[in-house]
Structure formats: C-alpha cells, structure tokens
C-alpha cells in the first residue's frame, strides 16, 4: 500500500504547518483512505553533521586503503584531550570519496542503525574509531554503498550548505526523523495510488487549496505529430489487438516521446532518490528513477526504452501461442494468447521482437543501460482486466500492474511524459522531442443521468441541490442541468469507477460524511410471516443438539473432484455425469459441486488428523446439489430487461435440486483414559446416537433399517450401516465408514459417520408441537425378555415388534445383551431386552403383564424369534 510523505504531499496541496502523521491519517480516513500503519524510523541518534578536518590515507597489508580521519562534530560531541580541550573525533573510514573539507553524516556511539546495528567505539586498523561516517545503505536510505554521504551533493543550496554546522542534528537532513503514513487503497480508488490523487482527497477532506499538476503539464506538452501536418512522428506506433477480452481493447492509448542526447552518467538528484526510497522503491538510474517518480507523483506508470536498440514500428499486440519472454528480473515466462505485448519490428518484420509484457514488466531487450543516450518514453492506457490477468498469471505484482488493474487516467499520458521529459532534460541534459506520437482510441465518456433525489432515497441524506452540484464538480465531474433536480454528469478521466447514479450517490455520501447518514431502525412486520420459518428453527435445533452432543460445527467449500470421488469409492466418470460442473472453479482439481456433504467434511477431518488431532467429532449443515441429466437446459436470458414469469420458470426448472443435509464424522476415541475407566474407541453406535438425538430434538419418529450387504453404498461398511427411515421415507445413512475409505483418508479404524437429508426429514413432520407423554403415577412392571433369532434379524426389527405388541403400556425398552455360541445354535443369536410396562390409568396386575408378554411372544414368532427360557 502507498507510503505518504507529508513533504512530498505539499507539492500539490496546502498543508498546515506542523501537520502530524496522526492528524493526516484522521483527515484521510474521513474520505475513505484508511490508515494501515504509521511507520517510524529504524534509526535512532545521536546522528550529527560532521566536518572532516583531515583524512590521512593508510595503505593496509591486505591491499585496502583506509582513511584515518579527524571529524569536527561540534563542542557537544567532540572528544576531550588530556588538557581538557575539545578536539575532533578520530574515525576510521574506508570510503573512497572521503576527503578533508567535506561535511558528512556522523553516527556517534549510542546510535542504532537498521538491522539493530549499534555504534560504539571500537579498535580497528590500529586506531580507536569513535563513531562512523555513514553511507546511504547504512542508514537504510538505499543500496548505494560506494561511498559515504557528502552533504555537498545532497541537493542543498549554497546558503543552506554553508548553514550546516558541525554537531547539528542530522536526522532531519535525509528525513531519518520523519515517519511515513501507509494507507489502504480499495480496488475502485486506483487514482489514490499517487500523490496527485491523495492530495486531491486531502483537499476533499479539509478544504485545503489543491492544484492538479496535470493541468499545467498538459498545457506545456507539445501537440502530437499527427496534429501537425507535415511533421514526422518520433516513432511509428500501431495497436493491433486481435483477441480483446470481453470485447475491450487491451490498449486504447499509446503515447510515445523521445529524449535525445541524454547523459547516461547523470546521477539521480538526492531529493528524488530520498523520495523514492521513502516510498519503498530502489534507486536504479536517472532514467528509470524518473519514470518511477512520475508514476508515484501522478499515477501514470511509464517505461523507458533504449531508442537506439529499437526498430519501428512499435506494435502493441496479443501474444501468439508458444511465445516466451524474459523479463527485467531475469525470469522466463511462457506467454498466453491473452497477454498483451509491446513489440518492435527488426528487419521490417512487424511486431516480431517482444520488448515487454504491457503494463506489467519490461523485457531484457531494449532496457535502459549505462550506455543509453537516446530514450523512448512510453505512457499508455491499458485495459484493467488484461493487465490483472497477466500479472496474476505470471505472478508479477509490479507497481505498474497494481495501478493499471485499478484504472489509470486516460488523459494523463501527455502530462506524465512531459514531466519525465522535463526531469531528464534538467538532470540528464537530454533534449525532449517536440513531435510525440499519440495513438488515442479512448472512448468518449458517457453522461450519467442523475436525479438529486437519489441521494435521499439511497443514502437517507438531505443534501441541497446546489451542494450536490458543488461536490460532483469538486471531484472532477462535468455537471450540466440541475434546474429540475436532474443532472447530466460526466465522470472525470481518472474515475473509471463512476458509471451509474449509485456511484455518484456514494461519492456524495463519502464527502458529506458517512457519520451524517441518519440511524434508522427498520420496522419489523406486524402481519404475515414473522421471524424464522419452521424449517429454519428446526435447522437450529439440529445444530444445537449436535453441539450439545459434543460435536463441533464446520463449514467447508462445496467443491469436489476426482480425488474425493476415489477416496469414497465412487466411480469418478459415473459421478461426474450427475454432478454440477462449475464453469470457473475456484480450485482446478475440484470443479464439481458436491452431491453429499461427507466428502467435503472429510477433507476438514483429514486436515485435523494430519496435524495430530485424531479424536475428531465434526458436523456440517449445508446444501448439496443433485443435478438431473434429463433436466431442461438453463436458458440464456437477455440483459437489460426484467425476465418474464415464463423465463424465470424455465430457469428454475433447469436448476439442480438443492436439499439441506446434515453430516457428521467421528474418529478416534469416544472416551479417553481416565480415573473412571479405560478408553473407548468410536464406533457405529456413536453415530447412531447422534442421529437419534437429532430425531428426538425435532420430534421425528425414525427407524433404522439394515439392508443386505449388496445394497449398502460403497462408502459405508456393508455390515455396520443402516438406512434412516421415517415410515416409508428414506432420509439418510448412519454407521461406520468402509475400511477402504478410512484407509484412503488416513482415518482411524471404525470411524463412524452419518448423513441425513433434512429437507426430506422435515417434510415428514406435521408441524405440531411434540407432545410429552403423561407421567403415570402407577407402579412399573419390569421384565427381561431374551429371544433367539436368525443372525439376519436385526435388533431394531425385533425392538419394533416388541413395541407394536406391547402397545401403550410399554414405557421403555433397552437392548442389554447380544450373545452367540453353541447354546443358541449355528446361524442364531440371542437378543436380550430390559422392558418396563406401566399403565397410565391403573396398576398392572400379574394377569395384565402376562397378557402383554404373551402378545409380544406371539408377535415375535412372526419373524422367527423364540423366547428363551
């Protein structure tokens, strides 16, 4: 995010004396530019101005020559000799540019430099060095370590230089004592990625006088050559975009201007280098630094080419299949046909040599070097989507791409090039051409029909019509009309985000002040459906019950792919045919919407287990997507008009069914070791208990039906899974996951799970409150019943028989023993139940309980069950 320097900001807007960075942050946040951080200096003093009294070269055995210097640091900081007199400090310095008579920056013992480098007296090269003459790199001001800072070369006037006295605090000279404000820029406010834009916003916040630098620069910029009949252009430029994204040309303006006879040995002025470094950019060379400085100041990314290496025409085109580019950072990139390129035409082969990835980064060929004397300046306007995609595709988030993808001013190119040309002329003795080439195909801005009443309707603000006009004019809009409260508003060239009336309402609300929007509480409806629907209430009850059971809710992305299908034993090809495929998936390996929650929930469980958490108990509520391959195709609806009821019905008919599901997975230990007993692993009974609790909470009368092994889905254990039924309605599965699934996912053995179709389950409910069974005051009759049954008969089947036969007098039933062995015979098992009978109206006699018992035995015989003696 941009770093804001108050001294630089002063170039464009009046700033009150003594403005602090804290106050600047408060002023900018009023207009939507949030403070990210105020960065303090990494350098602490004492750091002072020193005058080099003498510098004696001393050659060393290693071939290096050091200077033994005496530096006057002022009476406060000078050393004291044996007689008590103040004398210059003795300092060792190895810099080649150290010489007597210079004023330098001296870091004294006690100072701390970047990297926690502490300055203290130390013996070196046979002397005690009592301080250090600092270079830019040592102070964190840049990469220049070829010599120490000579204040004579630091941009001071002659009078200012003479006024620098030994011992004077030097922290402020290279701005080491000044913090920086880092602000957060939203994607729609790309113009504030420049001092020009931030100064404008400071003006909006405080009313301070603001001068747009682009106005004067545009006035000074020469007319393009095509506006001057008979005048040759600097270089021919062609825009040839044969693959525009969404029909939008990748480049609609390309402005080229030449600077000749540039001095390649010219140095970047210290004031500019300081500003670039404080903005977080590296000083490279005057030509490159100028283009970066213009970008930071005005907001127009620029590129400088070595003109002598180029052959016209310059062609802006899309990449061809198989083309490659080596960028300035030395990395080779395989280009996409969506990438926009800057190319030239060697040997008359039009657009055959790639110079750079437009709006992102230049290539190695054509870059400015230490021998460059003639420069081609490029300032263009590129499509936001094109640049954003290229930057992300090649992982090059450059400063230029950050600005282009947020939108750059379409009218700024001449001004930016003029500013760069002036700086190159002033500091590099270059000669700017007066015949730039401007290929300008930018569309004419459309007027927005805006009603003043929209401000009150949308934002609730009562703003006078004249103030509305003033605000829109102040942000740069051209405003016409207004007599009847309606305006024709044309957005300024630097605001591509202003396209609709609601955008203008947002701007007015922003500048009036969000704190001025009245607080109104929307009235609650007093008729019709109020509050949560019955199904919403039931969903909450399900979530509450599972949480009370000790499970933790999880939310996962509803995307699945081949790996998920295979882990659960599904046939990927068959499953894809009935799955909804996403046109632009978030993850390339998960392009389908889930048909069940378990595969996506399993990913979360798997992630926990991989991090060493084996005892996992998670559940998730959400949609699944059941696509019918025979469903009608979803129609393409026309834009700009409201669809008809028939069109909406056709759209709805083509959508997949999206029922609500709840799923849970339990792994590891259900009960850990403790003083009350040993550990117990999770098994199918824990999942069954979770399902029973859900049913009990919402009042559903579920039954568990264990099918034949061949009828169990592949993800479930064939002998330890059951259907969850409500009468004849299938609502889900519960049991243990198949051992193959546990192995594929890395789950512990016997991991259990459940998945219920809540939409189907809720549909079985009457909507009437669950009635609590009346409490009987009569005594209970307790009996234990043990039956011998075939191994194929489930405990649930026998329990249902007992419930049916006992009728209303059955209070409770619990399976307490399952036994197999020689005593019951081969292919048989014994199921023992503890049952309690109690009448709501009388005390059950021995005859009553005996009659109930006989009824149970008779009913059980229908499924082959025999009462054991």
Annotate each language-model stretch with its function:
Residues 3, 23, 473-480, 619, ...:
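A carboxyl-terminal module marker
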Residues 3-6, 12, 24-26, 41, ...:
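Glycine/proline-enriched, intrinsically flexible loops and inter-domain linkers
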Residues 197, 448-616, 836-838, 843-844, ...:
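Extended, well-folded interaction surfaces typified by the phenylalanyl-tRNA synthetase beta subunit core
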Residues 43-46, 219-221, 294-296, 490, ...:
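Beta-rich nucleic-acid/ligand-interaction surfaces
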Residues 49-91, 273-274, 278, 291-368:
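Conserved mixed alpha/beta core segments that line enzyme active sites in large multi-domain catalysts
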Residues 122, 315-368, 524-658, 720, ...:
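Class II aminoacyl-tRNA synthetase-like tRNA-binding/catalytic domains
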Residues 128-150, 157-160, 174-175, 179, ...:
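Mobile "lid/hinge" segments at catalytic clefts and subdomain interfaces of large enzymes
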Residues 1-229, 351, 376, 393-395, ...:
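Phosphate-backbone binding interfaces of nucleic-acid-interacting proteins
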């Amino acid at each position: 995010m941009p770093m804001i320097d108050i001294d630089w900001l002063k170039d464009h807007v009046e700033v009150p004396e003594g403005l602090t960075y804290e106050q600047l942050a408060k002023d900018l946040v009023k207009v939507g530019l949030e403070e990210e951080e105020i960065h303090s200096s990494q350098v602490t003093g004492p750091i002072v101005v020193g005058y080099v009294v003498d510098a004696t070269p001393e050659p060393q055995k290693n071939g290096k020559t050091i200077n033994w210097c005496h530096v006057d640091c002022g009476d406060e900081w000078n050393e004291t000799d044996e007689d008590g007199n103040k004398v210059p400090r003795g300092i060792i310095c190895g810099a080649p540019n150290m010489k007597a008579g210079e004023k330098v920056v001296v870091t004294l013992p006690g100072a701390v430099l970047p990297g926690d480098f502490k300055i203290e007296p130390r013996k070196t090269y046979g002397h005690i060095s009592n301080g250090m003459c600092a270079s830019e790199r040592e102070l964190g001001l840049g990469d220049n370590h070829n010599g120490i800072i000579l204040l004579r070369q630091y941009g001071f006037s002659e009078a200012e230089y003479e006024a620098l006295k030994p011992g004077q605090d030097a922290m402020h000279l290279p701005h080491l004592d000044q913090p920086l404000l880092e602000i957060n820029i939203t994607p729609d406010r790309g113009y504030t990625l420049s001092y020009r834009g931030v100064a404008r916003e400071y003006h909006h916040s405080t009313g301070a006088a603001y001068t747009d630098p682009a106005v004067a620069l545009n006035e000074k910029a020469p007319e393009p050559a095509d506006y001057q009949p008979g005048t040759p252009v600097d270089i021919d430029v062609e825009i040839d975009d044969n693959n525009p994204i969404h029909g939008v040309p990748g480049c609609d303006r390309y402005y080229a201007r030449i600077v000749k006879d540039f001095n390649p040995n010219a140095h970047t002025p210290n004031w500019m280098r300081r500003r670039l470094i404080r903005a977080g950019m590296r000083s490279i060379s005057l030509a490159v630094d100028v283009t970066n400085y213009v970008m930071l100041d005005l907001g127009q990314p620029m590129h400088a080419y070595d003109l002598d290496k180029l052959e016209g025409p310059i062609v802006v085109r899309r990449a061809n299949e198989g083309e490659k580019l080596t960028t300035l950072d030395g990395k080779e990139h395989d280009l996409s046909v969506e990438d926009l390129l800057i190319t030239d035409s060697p040997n008359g082969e039009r657009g055959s040599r790639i110079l750079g990835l437009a709006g992102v980064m230049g290539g190695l060929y054509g870059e400015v070097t230490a021998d460059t004397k003639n420069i081609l300046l490029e300032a263009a306007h590129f499509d936001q989507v094109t640049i954003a995609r290229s930057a992300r595709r090649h992982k090059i988030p450059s400063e230029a791409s950050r600005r282009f993808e947020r939108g750059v001013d379409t009218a700024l190119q001449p001004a930016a090039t003029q500013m760069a040309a002036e700086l190159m002329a002033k500091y590099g003795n270059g000669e700017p051409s007066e015949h730039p080439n401007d290929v300008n195909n930018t569309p004419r801005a459309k007027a927005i029909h805006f009603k003043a009443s929209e401000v009150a309707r949308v934002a609730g603000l009562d703003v006078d019509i004249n103030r509305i006009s003033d605000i829109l004019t102040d942000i740069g809009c051209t405003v016409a009309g207004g007599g009847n409260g309606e305006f024709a508003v044309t957005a300024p060239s630097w605001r591509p985000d202003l396209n609709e009336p609601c955008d203008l309402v947002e701007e007015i609300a922003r500048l009036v002040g969000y704190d001025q929007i009245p607080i109104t509480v929307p009235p609650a409806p007093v008729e019709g459906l109020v509050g949560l629907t019955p199904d919403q209430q039931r969903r909450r009850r399900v979530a509450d019950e599972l949480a009370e059971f000790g499970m933790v809710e999880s939310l996962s992305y509803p995307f699945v792919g081949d790996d998920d299908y295979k882990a659960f034993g599904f046939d990927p090809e068959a499953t894809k045919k009935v799955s909804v495929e996403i046109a632009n998936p978030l993850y390339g390996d998960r392009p389908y919407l889930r048909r069940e929650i378990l595969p996506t929930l399993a990913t979360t469980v798997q992630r926990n287990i991989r991090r060493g958490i084996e005892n996992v108990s998670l559940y998730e509520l959400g949609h699944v997507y059941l696509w019918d391959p025979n469903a009608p195709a979803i129609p393409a609806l026309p834009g700009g008009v409201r669809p008809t009821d028939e069109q909406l019905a056709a759209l709805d008919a083509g959508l997949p069914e999206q029922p609500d599901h709840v799923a849970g997975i339990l792994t590891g230990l259900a009960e850990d070791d403790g003083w009350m007993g040993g550990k117990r692993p999770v098994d199918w009974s824990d999942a069954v208990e979770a399902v029973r609790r859900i049913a009990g909470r919402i009042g559903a009368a579920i039954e568990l039906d264990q099918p034949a092994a061949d009828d169990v889905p592949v993800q479930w254990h064939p002998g330890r899974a059951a259907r969850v039924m409500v009468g004849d309605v299938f609502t889900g599965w519960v049991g243990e996951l198949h051992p193959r699934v546990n192995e594929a996912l890395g789950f512990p053995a016997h991991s259990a799970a459940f998945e219920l179709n809540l939409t189907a389950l809720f549909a079985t409910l009457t909507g009437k409150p669950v009635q609590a069974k009346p409490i009987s005051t009569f005594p209970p009759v307790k009996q234990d019943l043990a039956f011998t049954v075939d191994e194929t008969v489930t405990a649930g089947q026998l329990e249902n028989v007992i419930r049916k036969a006992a009728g209303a007098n059955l209070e409770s039933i619990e399976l307490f023993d399952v036994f197999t062995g020689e005593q019951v015979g081969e292919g048989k098992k014994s199921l023992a139940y503890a049952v309690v009978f109690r009448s709501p109206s009388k005390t059950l006699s021995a005859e009553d309980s005996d009659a109930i018992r006989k009824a149970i035995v008779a009913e059980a015989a229908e499924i082959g069950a025999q009462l054991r003696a």
